[in-house]
């Protein structure tokens, strides 16, 4: 049945070639992707970023201070969840690449069927169950891993969809720019919804902690009414659930818009071959492509740097800087700055090239990270650093997704008989970044445990503040510099990219001529 469906889909696509206004009829590439289609495609990127930003900024502090999971076990949850998430990416990518074409396409059905289960599991991540101990750890670990699996079933096909919304590289680059703008806007929404709803609640802290027992924190709260403390903590937990519900509603809405507003286009050169390949064959081909390895290695280091920032910035602002009541607003400024500067970086990479944009964009945050750690606590300075960090975050968001299609085009030219590997390219990039995220969260939370982090304390020991400074400044700066050094080896510059574009255009035109001749011969017979 799958083969019959695939043949029918292929025949349908070939049958459309004589229709007026079809993409094949326009060999000069005049049929550009509409702005509406680009916007609908871009909106599909919001759910992953909204949920990812909320989890990245707030899950650690939620587990530590609201669910009151001890730091060691919180590190296990965060690390295991992200590593599991990383493992599922290449597996989902492989299964997506083996999917047969349907009326919706090959990729969009994954979006449709994963969405309802993803939103339920996301809600349960932010729910504090009525039990404690190992059962609570298992609860968060199961639903965190389940959500990461389901959101992967959404995001990997969506990422691969970049290659199938248009045959024109300029359209794909433009759509990527739209997508990055919406995705960074999604991080603003995630930060705003989670931060502002939760930030309205005054989560109580404990001035003096005498002793803490595993899963059953025993504290002496001086000058703090215990009844008020319990009620306030309960209202904070409710606020987290309300924020999760709002985010889930946006998730579903974005999935509907993506499904209804975007149509997959099966590329002309892909129709020439549908030879089956195993997971290991596809993986071997992809991982032997040197430009891809160099690209993802460079972004692995820079992504790890920004994930360390994301995972620890809220704790740094709350405890080291002392901005307990302002941290959600500072995070919001970071994301707003990133959103507003994505169009600038889109223009910059078009004008000066993508490698140049990498060097300028990602390195721009370094002096401000050093400044915020060396200077005394200053709210105005914190907002200045937030704006500068947003500028660099925008570049870090845009550039990988803008450069991956160039690597895939280069792969297609060097492996003309191998098709359908696009999901593996995207999924393995996401695999490495998520693995880096798991490592960063696990190491940072474990480091805080070793430094003596005190759950719900109003202030932390000096060792904890020093650890947060290392996680916010020293480690990210070193990782960014290593990543930028590796980008020197990346071979696809602007000249090479333009050569690949011309070569692919010639292949597509040749294939269209061949298809047209075959159809004409068949009609004559």
From Swiss-Prot:
It catalyses: a 1-acyl-sn-glycero-3-phosphocholine(in) + Na(+)(in) = a 1-acyl-sn-glycero-3-phosphocholine(out) + Na(+)(out); 1-(4Z,7Z,10Z,13Z,16Z,19Z-docosahexaenoyl)-sn-glycero-3-phosphocholine(in) + Na(+)(in) = 1-(4Z,7Z,10Z,13Z,16Z,19Z-docosahexaenoyl)-sn-glycero-3-phosphocholine(out) + Na(+)(out); 1-(9Z-octadecenoyl)-sn-glycero-3-phosphocholine(in) + Na(+)(in) = 1-(9Z-octadecenoyl)-sn-glycero-3-phosphocholine(out) + Na(+)(out); 1-hexadecanoyl-sn-glycero-3-phosphocholine(in) + Na(+)(in) = 1-hexadecanoyl-sn-glycero-3-phosphocholine(out) + Na(+)(out). Residues 63-73, 127-137, 202-226, 319-329, 375-377, 452-463 are extracellular. GO terms for molecular function: lysophospholipid:sodium symporter activity; symporter activity. Residues 1-32, 95-106, 163-169, 261-291, 349-352, 415-424, 488-525 are cytoplasmic. Pfam families: MFS_2. Sodium-dependent lysophosphatidylcholine (LPC) symporter, which plays an essential role for blood-brain barrier formation and function. Specifically expressed in endothelium of the blood-brain barrier of micro-vessels and transports LPC into the brain. Transport of LPC is essential because it constitutes the major mechanism by which docosahexaenoic acid (DHA), an omega-3 fatty acid that is essential for normal brain growth and cognitive function, enters the brain. Transports LPC carrying long-chain fatty acids such LPC oleate and LPC palmitate with a minimum acyl chain length of 14 carbons. Belongs to the major facilitator superfamily. This is Sodium-dependent lysophosphatidylcholine symporter 1.
């Amino acid at each position: 049945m799958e083969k019959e469906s695939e043949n029918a889909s292929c025949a349908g696509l070939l049958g459309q070639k004589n229709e007026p206004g079809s993409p094949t009829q326009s060999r000069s590439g005049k049929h550009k992707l509409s702005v509406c289609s680009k916007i609908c495609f871009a909106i599909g990127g919001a759910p992953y970023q909204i949920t990812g930003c909320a989890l990245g900024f707030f899950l650690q502090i939620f587990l530590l201070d609201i669910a009151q999971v001890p730091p060691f076990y919180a590190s296990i949850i965060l690390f295991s969840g992200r590593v599991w998430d990383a493992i599922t990416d290449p597996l989902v990518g492989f299964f997506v690449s083996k999917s047969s074409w349907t009326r919706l396409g090959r990729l969009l059905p994954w979006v449709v069927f994963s969405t309802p289960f993803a939103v339920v599991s996301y809600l349960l991540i932010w729910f504090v169950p009525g039990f404690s101990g190992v059962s609570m750890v298992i609860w968060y670990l199961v639903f965190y891993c389940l959500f990461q699996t389901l959101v992967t079933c959404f995001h990997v096909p969506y990422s691969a969809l970049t290659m199938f919304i248009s045959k024109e590289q300029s359209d794909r680059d433009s759509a990527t720019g739209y997508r990055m703008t919406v995705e960074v806007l999604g991080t603003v929404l995630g930060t705003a919804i989670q931060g502002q709803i939760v930030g309205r609640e005054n989560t109580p802290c404990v001035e003096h902690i005498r002793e803490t027992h595993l899963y059953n924190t025993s504290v002496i709260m001086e000058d703090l009414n215990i009844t008020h403390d319990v009620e306030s903590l309960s209202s904070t937990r409710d606020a987290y659930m309300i924020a999760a519900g709002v985010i889930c509603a946006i998730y579903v809405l974005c999935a509907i818009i993506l499904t209804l507003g975007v149509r997959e286009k099966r590329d002309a050169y892909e129709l020439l071959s549908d030879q089956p390949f195993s997971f290991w064959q596809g993986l071997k081909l992809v991982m032997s492509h040197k430009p891809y390895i160099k690209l993802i290695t460079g972004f692995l280091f820079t992504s790890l740097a920004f994930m360390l920032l994301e995972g620890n910035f809220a704790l740094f602002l709350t405890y080291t800087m002392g901005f307990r009541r302002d941290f959600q607003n500072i995070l919001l400024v970071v994301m707003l700055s990133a959103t507003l500067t994505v169009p600038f970086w889109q223009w910059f990479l078009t004008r000066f090239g993508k490698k140049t944009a990498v060097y300028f964009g990602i390195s721009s945050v370094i002096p401000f990270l050093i400044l915020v750690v060396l200077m005394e606590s200053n709210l105005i300075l914190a907002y200045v650093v937030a704006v500068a960090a947003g500028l660099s975050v925008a570049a870090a968001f845009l550039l990988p997704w803008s450069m991956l299609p160039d690597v895939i085009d280069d792969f297609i030219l060097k492996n003309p008989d191998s098709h359908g590997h696009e999901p593996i390219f995207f999924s393995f990039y996401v695999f490495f970044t998520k693995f880096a995220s798991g490592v960063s969260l696990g190491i940072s939370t474990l480091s805080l445990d070793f430094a003596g982090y005190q759950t719900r304390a109003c202030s932390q020991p000096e060792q904890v503040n020093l650890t947060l400074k290392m996680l916010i400044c020293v480690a990210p700066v070193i990782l960014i510099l290593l990543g930028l050094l590796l980008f020197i080896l990346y071979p696809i510059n602007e000249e090479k990219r333009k050569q690949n574009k011309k070569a692919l255009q010639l292949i597509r035109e040749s294939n269209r001529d061949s298809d047209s001749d075959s159809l004409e011969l068949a009609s004559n017979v």
